[in-house]
């Protein structure tokens, strides 16, 4: 029996022009959905993008016994968890499923899940999560390969915890655990990312007590219970970065509204150095490229406020179109540049050495068949295809659906020759 799958078809060589409003950040929405498990009153999240990872999170909430439903572009959440075992098939699909364990431990004293999935971009251990939870009274049972069973037999209690690396996921997990733990938790070495501050803001709006968000030290006074609220998540700085890089790669002028340029300033600064015209104004940015792009030299990712690791592949796609040499090193994940194989298939002169992607000028990009290796690498291949001459077909669309809502429609509205189709194998 024939199997069908979607692919993205791009005819490159067309500039982008127009305005796009930046949607809510996936990396903010997912921990907010997990945080709703702590709330004893209804929660409404406004303007949530319809992503497959969001749908997985809603399925996890329903599996725990909560009500989670779409109301237009909002998500309405209510009810208390009654089931401590997360649906295995759903939990395995995304890394953020680990975030749901901390609220279940706080509410039910137990959490069971499969080890979380997500993009294969390198080692993504959860040892920092588990070490911190152990300091708060959590025990890990031997549940066999691929499973995680956590118990808090005496409930969660506050603790002083120092992270050896400012992991966003570990910071969010421990913040969620501490919000309803007994006593005070002091978390040092915490991630400073805006999405962490957004989670802290949400918890405070629901009656929690979190101080120091945006700094490397968080002080959380545990509450017996949290209420609810109506909350608008932070705009998506990675989506904005991707569209800014699309304008650089394809040429033209794109205005991005509803997202502070400070959230993705490193990307904008690098694009400006490469020859793009970048005009900032309040909550909007215009990125224009009508002439040549120049090499960026060597750039590095890092923890916030440095260049975000998730923005590295789209930025690399823009570098493919430059006349000078560029290299980009990701210090977070060792397999961040799996998209390099696709870049080479398009004609790019690229090579990888460890965590570094080297890009040399002179490669004439021509359309070809490609497959997205992961979420951000897939977006990078779409951007490179926009700059290539001829037709490209990009498989692995499910990766893109995890983090970009209506991606092809948005690019088409800007003038790209792009659409999705179902292919039959």
Label the model's feature ranges:
Residues 1-425:
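Short, structured segments at the rim of ligand-binding sites
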